Amino acid sequence: DGRAICLQAIAFIEQQRGRCMTNEKYGRERTLCFLPLNHIFGLMTNMIPTALEGNPQVYLHDRAPETILKTCRICKVELIMAVPLLINGLSSALQKKVSKLSAPKRRAFRALQNTSIAIQTAWPEGGMWIAKHVLFKSVNAQLFGPTLRQIALGGANAPQEHLRNIAALGYCVSFGYGMTETAVTAYDGAVDMKARLSGCSGKLLP
């Protein structure tokens, strides 16, 4: 049943994090319903277990880039499950804007990126907060906003260059793998920088 499926999924994630799950979590984690629900990825993530856990879902008026970003900011979205095209496009647009800056500003931006990656490598959770709320506060105010905790991707790989650009902003990007016949079969929810930049799909679900 739906409750059992939810508990199995949560238990696997907690096992990966090295924690012991002692009770069920009925959260208020706002999830962006980005994926079509008639697709196996959307069905098995936005419907099962997200909806069955009681988490509120945010629906898009359309899938224009600005609509996605504005919706996330206004509705304070915390979790996005999508395909790599989302962050690839965002990273490319960011790089294009940076390339138009003056040379000193470009160097300053790159220095902030390197600083952010270094802090997150040493202190993943705290580093993400610092990157999101301090180093790139003004940038994130124009993107997903400060509330977004995780972007879970599936369906394809993403270039490391794009993963690094998004990670530097303080957003945690993770990957999973699945097929139409089996739904989600693997997931990597690690927050350390090495795992986030590897693009690894993680361990097989039990």
Question: What are the functions of these language-model segments?
Answer:
Residues R3, L85, A156-N157:
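Alpha-helix/helix-capping structural signal
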Residues V58-Y59, P124-G127, A141, P146-G154, ...:
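Conserved ATP-binding loop and adjacent catalytic segment of the adenylate-forming AMP-binding
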